[in-house]
Curated annotation (Swiss-Prot):
Disordered, as annotated region: 1-33, 146-179
Protein name, UniProt field: Protein FAM177A1
Residue stretches of biased makeup (Low complexity): 13-29
Source organism (scientific name): Bos taurus
Taxonomy, superkingdom: Eukaryota
Stretches with biased composition (Polar residues): 161-179
Bias (Basic and acidic residues): 1-11
Coiled-coil parts of chain: 135-172
Encoding gene (name): FAM177A1
Record-annotated disulphide pairs: none
PANTHER family: LP10445P (PTHR31206), PROTEIN FAM177A1 (PTHR31206:SF5)
Presence of the UniProt keyword Phosphoprotein in the record: yes
């Protein structure tokens, strides 16, 4: 009798372990299938995001350049599509049909009035700002200040250049001055030597008569 309960417990344990293994295998298979499905979805999204060039530019050299639309252009086009949905007036009933044409006439009238009003205002000078004189005066004063600063800067640069040239000229004169002094002393020495020679020759030509 004691062997039967033990064998029964062992059988239950084996069944429980088998059920656990089966559930684990089922979970792993489900996880693998989910991962494969996720991979497939990602690949599908990547394939859809492939951009088509908006236009292709051909150069004379034979090269081509593809121009793609930016994300902002795509967003603007989507907004325009959302704001202005296509409407076929032939498929509308009488009420929406009349409302559609009334809205179209009103928008066209407003756009024409806006255009004409802008042109008339520009002709009559109404579109100019109220304080345009003050604005013009401010810009004129600012321009004069800029011109004055430019003149001052140019005069300072010219004065600086003049000072540099003057210093260079003074240095050149100082470097040349010892040479001129040496040459003048050399000339004076020559003159003195020539004078002494003339005195000696005259004394030789006119000997002094000694009384006997």
């Amino acid at each position: 009798m004691e062997g039967e309960p033990a064998s029964r417990e062992e059988g239950e344990a084996v069944n429980a372990s088998g059920a656990a293994a089966a559930s684990a295998f089922r979970e792993s298979a489900q996880q693998m299938s989910n991962e494969r499905g996720f991979e497939n979805v990602e690949l599908g999204v990547i394939g859809k995001k492939k951009k088509v060039p908006r236009r292709v530019i051909h150069f004379v050299s034979g090269e081509t350049m593809e121009e793609y639309s930016t994300d902002e252009d795509e967003v603007d086009s989507l907004e325009k599509k959302d704001v202005l949905p296509p409407v076929d007036p032939t498929k509308l009933t009488w009420g929406p049909y009349l409302w559609f044409h009334m809205l179209r006439a009103a928008t066209s009238t407003l756009s024409v009035c806006d255009f004409l009003g802008e042109k008339i205002a520009s002709v009559l000078g109404i579109s100019t700002p109220k304080y345009q004189y003050a604005i013009d005066e401010y810009y004129r004063m600012k321009k004069e200040e800029e011109e004055e600063e430019e003149e001052n800067r140019m005069s300072e640069e010219a004065e600086r250049q003049y000072q540099q040239n003057k210093l260079q000229a003074d240095s050149v004169v100082q470097s040349d001055q010892p040479e001129t002094l040496a040459s003048s002393s050399f000339v004076n020495l020559n003159f003195e030597m020539e004078g002494d020679c003339e005195v000696i020759t005259e004394s030789k030509q006119n000997p002094v008569s000694v009384p006997l």
